[in-house]
Amino acid sequence: MSLLHSILLGLVQGVAEFLPISSSGHLAIVEQILGVKGAAEVPGFFDVLLHLGTLAAVFVAYWPEIWEMIQEFFRGISDLIHGTTPTPVPPARRMILLVIVGTLPLFAILGIKDWIESLSSNLYVVGGALIVTGCLLFTSDRVRKGRKNEHSARMTDALIVGAAQALATCPGLSRSGTTISVGCFLGFERKFAVRYSFIMSIPAVLGANILSLKDALGGEVIWKDVPVYLLGVLVAAIVGYACIRLLKMIADKGKFGAFAYYC
């Protein structure tokens, strides 16, 4: 893989992972255009690294919230040991529960993971899924602004958003676009819908990469290209962080429709 290809794929991943336009769909299209997916399936390993780069961007952008959740996790264990329950439940602890419940539907699709990944080679599927993403975003702009946040969102809401996240593993369906839109349909505050979508992505992306890493390393990885890969990862992380900041500002205005026309 050339340096230019690595930078370009890192740029696409950083932009498309967080802006609601589907990173998997765009990577599939760009990889086919560039012809970088050869017999050695090198991009399989590279794709894993790219997702870890954008995952780092989530940690940086939401570190205060994530750190509070980590602390609250251990407080929760302490409360469990001592048989105490704080009233009301701290927001960070509710957020942990919402993320756990939202992650559960992903286990239902583990058995068809390989089939879902194979769809990325079919640009008709990818294109159709991008259209669905656009329709979701267009509709989400036209629903009444909600008021639910980590204080008031129900566990059933989290389960529904989690089911949407599981469906969004289909290449071309934007994970962020789908989960944010469904959150808006359920009455989430737009800021909370964005925050919940990105924080919920952490266990999803980690789990997906752990499952994919074994397969990726099982192929013929060209280790001398790893420095080139790492440059793409750095680009993905920096651009991803900038896109999270941008989407936060867009959420303040509650306007996601512009992305619908792009999709």
Residue spans for each PLM region:
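Multi-pass membrane proteins that catalyze or facilitate reactions on polyprenyl-/lipid-phosphate substrates
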Residues: 1-263
